[in-house]
From Swiss-Prot:
Proteolytically cleaved; targeted by its N-terminal leader sequence for import into the apicoplast where it undergoes proteolytic processing, resulting in an N-terminus starting at or near Gly-33 in the mature protein. This is Divergent heme oxygenase-like protein. Essential for blood-stage parasite viability. Required for apicoplast biogenesis. Associates with the apicoplast genome and mediates apicoplast gene expression. Can bind heme. Can bind protoporphyrin IX. The gene is HO. The keyword Nucleus does not apply. Keywords: Apicoplast, Glycoprotein, Heme, Iron, Metal-binding, Plastid, Signal. Glycans are attached at N132, N159, N288. Disruption phenotype: Conditional knockdown results in severe growth defects and widespread parasite death in the third intraerythrocytic growth cycle. Impaired apicoplast development. InterPro entries: Haem_Oase-like_multi-hlx. Residues 1-18 form the signal peptide. Coiled coil: none annotated. One of its GO terms (molecular function) is heme oxygenase (decyclizing) activity. It is found in: Plastid, Apicoplast.
C-alpha cells in the first residue's frame, strides 16, 4: 500500500514539472512569433525617456589633462599655452573665480616653479634652512599669521559699505583657531612673553593698510591670495613644523575650515557688479599679491653661518 502511494506521488510531481517545462517552451515560442509583440508590451514595464541636462564629464577632462601633460614631457612639460581656450579649461557657464582667478593663479605658480628649477642648486641643502628655526620662531610665525588675518578682518569692517558681503558671509573661523594655537604653543615655549610679531609682519600689515586706502580691489586680491595660499599649504606646513620641533598636539589651524570657499563665494557675487576693467584690475593684482606675501618665508630662510 505504501509503495503504491509513493509511486503515485512521484508520478504526480513529475507531471507537474513536465507541464512547467512545456509551458515555458511554448511561451518562448509565442513571444518569438508574429503576435508576440502584444504579449511583450503587456508583460514588460514602461520605459520612460529622461531628457537630463547635458553634464560635463570631469573624468574624461582629467584624463585629457594627463594625456596633454605627458605629451609635453621633457624640458617643455611646464610650457602651457594659457591663451588657448581648451574644451576642458573654459566653460561659459562657470563663474569668475573658476573662469579667470584660478587659471591666473595657476599661471603665476607655474612661473614661480620655473624660477625655482633654475635656482634649485642654490637651495639643494634643506638643512641650512631649519638650523635656526626654534619654537620661539614658530610662535612668532603663528603670531604673524594671526595679526595679518585679524588686520584683514578689521579692514573689512572699517570699509563695510564696500565689503559688506565679506563681513557676513566671508571667512571667520581661521583667526579663532590661530588664537587657540598661539595659547597652546606659548605654554610649551620658554619666555613666550618676550615673543612679539616680526618686522616682516608689521611691514606687510602697513602695506595692506595703504592698499585699502588707495586701491580696494588690489587689497581684496592680496587678502584672497593670503587666505588661499595658507589654506592650500597649512596642513603639510604646520604638521611638518610640529614634527620637527617635537610638538605633539595637533594644531587647530591645520584642520579644514570653509573660509576660502566662503571667500570665493563672496568674490563670485561681488564680481557680478564689476566692469571688465575692475575684473582686470583684480587679476593684475594677483601677481603682486603672490610676491608680496612671500615676505613671511623669511622666517625659514635663516641660513646658518
Amino acid at each position: 500500500m505504501i509503495r503504491k502511494i509513493i509511486i503515485l506521488m512521484f508520478t504526480f510531481f513529475s507531471n507537474i514539472h513536465n507541464e512547467k517545462i512545456y509551458h515555458h517552451k511554448q511561451r518562448r515560442k509565442f513571444l518569438k512569433g508574429p503576435l508576440g509583440y502584444l504579449n511583450r508590451n503587456v508583460i514588460q514595464k514602461k520605459h520612460y525617456n529622461l531628457y537630463a541636462k547635458k553634464f560635463i564629464n570631469y573624468k574624461e577632462i582629467q584624463i585629457q589633462r594627463i594625456n596633454d601633460y605627458r605629451k609635453r614631457s621633457g624640458v617643455d612639460k611646464n610650457n602651457i599655452n594659457y591663451n588657448l581656450r581648451d574644451t576642458y579649461n573654459y566653460h561659459e557657464t562657470h563663474l569668475f573665480v573658476r573662469n579667470e582667478v584660478l587659471p591666473t593663479l595657476a599661471k603665476i605658480e607655474n612661473e614661480n616653479l620655473k624660477e625655482k628649477e633654475k635656482n634649485k642648486e642654490i637651495f639643494r641643502n634643506i638643512n641650512d634652512y631649519n638650523s635656526n628655526f626654534t619654537r620661539q620662531t614658530f610662535l612668532q610665525f603663528l603670531m604673524d599669521l594671526y595679526n595679518i588675518f585679524l588686520k584683514i578682518d578689521d579692514l573689512f569692517l572699517e570699509n563695510k559699505t564696500y565689503f559688506s558681503i565679506l563681513i557676513y558671509n566671508g571667512p571667520m573661523q581661521l583667526t579663532n583657531h590661530l588664537y587657540d594655537d598661539i595659547i597652546y604653543v606659548s605654554s610649551v615655549v620658554e619666555n613666550s612673553d618676550d615673543v612679539s610679531p616680526s618686522e616682516y609682519c608689521m611691514e606687510y600689515i602697513s602695506h595692506l593698510e595703504n592698499l585699502c586706502e588707495e586701491n580696494k580691489l588690489s587689497f581684496l586680491a592680496h587678502a584672497y591670495v593670503f587666505y588661499k595660499n595658507f589654506h592650500l599649504s597649512k596642513e603639510h606646513l604646520l604638521k611638518s613644523i610640529c614634527k620637527y620641533l617635537n610638538i605633539i598636539k595637533k594644531l587647530k589651524s591645520s584642520t579644514y575650515v570653509a573660509d576660502v570657499e566662503n571667500f570665493e563665494f563672496c568674490l563670485n557675487k561681488m564680481s557680478r557688479k564689476w566692469s571688465r576693467w575692475e575684473k582686470d584690475n583684480f587679476l593684475a593684482s594677483l601677481h603682486n599679491a603672490t610676491n608680496k606675501m612671500m615676505i613671511l618665508t623669511k622666517h625659514f630662510e635663516k641660513v646658518k653661518s
